[in-house]
Amino acid sequence: MVIISYDIADDKIRSRFSKMLQKHGAIRLQFSVYELRNTKRIMDNLVVRIEDFSKHFTPADSVIIFDVESSHLTKYGNAIHRDQPIVYL
């Protein structure tokens, strides 16, 4: 499982980026944080798409991908509830 977090200033690019993540099966946890569980092939394709998007980023924009073991997660609060908790301690 991976957690993808992004900070993109341009509304149009941010909206397209969010839709692209959802198209690849990502589930929105918070406004700019997604969870994704998929095959290595799909993940590799997603990384290529993110690299394509990065060509349009400003120096202030960023995308961070966390490779996470779901057995080491804990979640608190009112985020989307999934089978596994989702907060790092």
Regions found by a protein language model. Give the residues of each.
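Extended, hydrophobic alpha-helical segments
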Residues: 1-41
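Extended aliphatic helical segments
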Residues: 2, 33, 47-48, 63, ...
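C-terminal structural segments of small proteins and small subunits
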Residues: 54-89
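Juxtamembrane helix-loop transition sites at the ends of transmembrane segments
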Residues: 28, 46, 51, 85-88
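Short, intrinsically disordered low-complexity segments
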Residues: 36-60
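Short amphipathic alpha-helical patches
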Residues: 32, 40-48, 69-77
